[in-house]
Swiss-Prot record:
GO terms for cellular component: bacterial nucleoid; chromosome; cytoplasm; replisome. Keywords: ATP-binding, Cytoplasm, DNA damage, DNA recombination, DNA repair, DNA-binding, Helicase, Hydrolase, Isomerase, Metal-binding, Nucleotide-binding, SOS response, Zinc. Its main location: cytoplasm. Optimal helicase activity requires 0.8-1.2 Mg(2+) per ATP molecule. Bind 1 Zn(2+) per monomer. It comes from Bacillus subtilis (strain 168). This is ATP-dependent DNA helicase RecQ. A motif (DEAH box) lies at residues 139-142. Disruption phenotype: Cells lacking this gene are moderately sensitive to DNA-damaging agents. Sensitivity increases in the presence of mutated AddAB nuclease. The lineage of its organism: Bacteria, Bacillati, Bacillota, Bacilli, Bacillales. Residues 27-196 form the Helicase ATP-binding domain. It holds the Pfam family RecQ_Zn_bind. An ATP-dependent DNA helicase which unwinds DNA in a 3'-5' direction. Requires between 2 and 5 single-stranded nucleotides on the 3'-end to initiate unwinding, is not active on blunt-ended DNA. Can target DNA replication, repair, and recombination intermediates; is active on forked, gapped and 3'-overhang DNA as well as 5'-flaps, Kappa joints, synthetic replication forks, and Holliday junctions. Prefers ATP over dATP, is not active with other nucleotides. Only unwinds short partial duplexes in vitro; SsbA enhances its activity on longer substrates.
């Protein structure tokens, strides 16, 4: 049976062998007919685990997903590969839904995608009772657990299937973010024996994780986006206001930027999302509302401009980078005042127990920002992996920046804060240290302080950056409230007493992630033109990974093209000639 599965994989998807865990998951549902849980990292190929069995079984596989935007992309990709599939959701007209339900009754589809809310429809359950449903795949299965970071009560509707379908289908639950408690809950809710779990770990070896502390965020984002101007990326923020601010800044810098958050109209969000998927926008600035169901495989970087609320959210959002397996970066820009933003959002909850749980998770997120250990290892241990190895490539593992003693400068700043009675914010303190003639500085008599102008060889901006560094290393703390004031921590007072020294590493450079060759860029243009004609996102035609391999191997005929990962029979027949022509034209030009 596995031989047939491999043959289908090559024919439809263009891959010669399964990735880790895929063959075991397929065996459990097709041969053993066991309800199965798949815990695999984002980009680990979870969808193949149910798409191949769907092709092997008679009847229609039902796929339950909360991600409306993902449904269309996945169905487009399946149809591009020559597989009959459809979806229904709330974005469609009654006529469209009626036609697709008729197709479902007639057995026209191998896979049929729905949201969990659809299971409350008596009419829909009756249709399922009248057709052959061999397999039900439940994507984003962590949504069924009250212990998960994204619990959705609608997922409890899945219980209806167990009650109402006489011929019990095999259940497959899939997730990329499940702590041990969430895993237990998934198995309990979906009648899965824990030993029937395919677990390939959470490690994403193609992702490089970094935490940037004590740096000017705006400058870092500007330089990073400029250095990676040919790559797609997402900048996440905790609030709509910050998303709007960064978006406007990038637009002023001539960046092809979009924005996405709950304060925008539905049609605006949809238009921005489609432009990003179609490579018309380089960068999307967004709150956590964006990304659930984004199957764009060539996102090369994810920057978090503010700390997320918990590790599950962070890993899920960061994990949208590099889904095609190519090298990508996930950078978290840490600033202590961002903790207060998340605390405020958490404290809006009326449930005391949930508040306590969420504050504990936020504390773990802050620990991640301060750890000097391997960042990938910290994440894996959070998700329950025992003694994972250091990744050797994250910002902490590869940090060779020289550290300079800045104790004297730190004492100047700390002394100034105390002399200002610890009643003012960062900008005012920086202005006093720089010797500013600002009206407020003079009115408050700060020009008479011994620390006035003591750092006049630096700009107010440079001093503000240095204060940010002292805050991030807990020498200075900030009060709560809309206009936070600075006060010296006990650690900072030890510096003033001469009992503790302060060392600062050189600023982290915003470097380019990868260098792309000319042929790869030409193949990307061919792909973009085809995608525009077909009305699908470019990655649905071929992934960046497939184009990279084409660029490296430069196939000259159909057989050689079929040996490239991601080129199946259908796509070879449909697009092969255009890509081979471009490769041949490039070869002639460079001879």
């Amino acid at each position: 049976m596995l031989h047939r599965a491999q043959s289908l994989l090559a024919h439809y998807f263009g891959y010669e062998k399964f990735r880790s865990g895929q063959d075991e998951a397929i065996r459990l549902v097709t041969e053993a007919r066991q309800n199965t849980a798949c815990i695999m990292p984002t980009g680990g190929g979870k969808s193949i685990c149910y798409q191949i069995p769907a092709l092997m079984f008679e009847g229609t596989t039902i796929v339950i997903s909360p991600l409306i935007s993902l449904m269309k992309d996945q169905v487009d990709a399946l149809e591009e590969a020559g597989i009959n599939a459809a979806y229904i959701n709330s974005t469609q007209s009654n006529q469209e839904i009626y036609e697709r339900l008729n197709g479902l009754k007639e057995g026209a589809y191998k896979l049929f995608y729905i949201t969990p809310e659809r299971l409350t429809s008596i009419e829909f359950i009756r249709i399922l009772q009248g057709i052959d449903v061999p397999l039900v795949a439940i994507d984003e299965a962590h949504c069924i657990s009250q212990w998960g970071h994204d619990f959705r009560p609608s997922y409890r509707n899945i219980e209806i299937l167990f009650r109402e379908l006489h011929d019990k289908p095999v259940i497959m639950a899939l997730t990329a973010t499940a702590t041990p408690e969430v895993h237990d809950d998934i198995c309990k809710q979906l009648h899965i024996q824990k030993e029937n779990t395919v677990y390939t770990g959470f490690s994403r070896e193609n992702l490089t994780f970094k935490v940037v502390k004590g740096e000017n965020k705006d400058r870092f984002i500007d330089e990073y986006v400029q250095n990676n101007r040919h790559e797609a990326g997402i900048v996440y923020t905790a609030t709509r206001k910050e998303a709007d601010r960064i978006y406007e800044r990038l637009k002023r810098n001539q960046v092809r930027a979009g924005r996405y958050h709950g304060g925008l109209a539905d049609d605006v969000r949809k238009e921005q999302q489609e432009r990003f998927l179609n490579d018309e926008l380089q960068v999307m600035v967004a709150t956590s509302a964006f990304g659930m169901g984004i199957d764009k495989s060539n996102i090369r970087f994810v920057l978090h401009a503010q700390i997320p609320k918990d590790m599950e959210s962070y890993y899920q959002e960061a994990g949208r980078a590099g889904r095609d397996g190519l090298a990508s970066e996930c950078v978290l820009l840490f600033s202590p005042q961002d903790i207060m933003v998340q605390r405020f959002l958490i404290e809006q909850s009326e449930h005391e127990e949930k508040q306590k749980q969420d504050l504990k998770k936020l504390r773990q997120m802050v620990d991640y920002c301060h750890t000097e250990d391997c960042l990938q290892r910290f994440i894996l241990m959070y998700f329950g992996e025992k003694e994972p190895d250091a990744c050797g490539q994250c910002g902490n593992c590869t940090d060779t920046r020289a550290a300079h003693d800045v104790t004297r400068e730190a004492q100047m700043v700390l002394s100034c804060i105390i002399r200002m009675k610890e009643r003012f914010g960062k900008t005012m303190v920086a202005q006093v240290l720089a010797g500013s003639k600002n009206k407020k500085v003079l009115e408050n008599g700060f020009s008479d302080l011994s620390t006035y102008g003591i750092l006049k060889h630096q700009s107010v901006g440079e001093i503000s950056d240095f204060i940010e560094f002292l805050i991030s290393d807990d020498f200075i703390r900030m009060s709560d409230g809309t206009f936070p004031t600075l006060f010296v921590s006990s650690k900072g007072r030890n510096v003033l007493k001469g009992e503790l020294s302060v060392a600062r590493k050189e600023a982290l450079k915003a470097a380019a992630i990868t260098e792309n060759d000319e042929l790869f860029e030409r193949l990307r243009m061919v792909r973009k033109e085809i995608a525009a004609e077909q009305g699908v996102p470019p990655f649905v035609v071929f992934s960046d990974q497939t184009l990279k391999e084409m660029s490296g191997k430069q196939p000259v005929n159909d057989d050689e093209l079929l040996s490239i990962k991601g080129v199946g029979e259908q796509k070879r027949a449909k697009y092969g000639r255009l890509f081979l022509q471009e490769i041949q034209a490039y070869a002639r030009m460079t001879d």
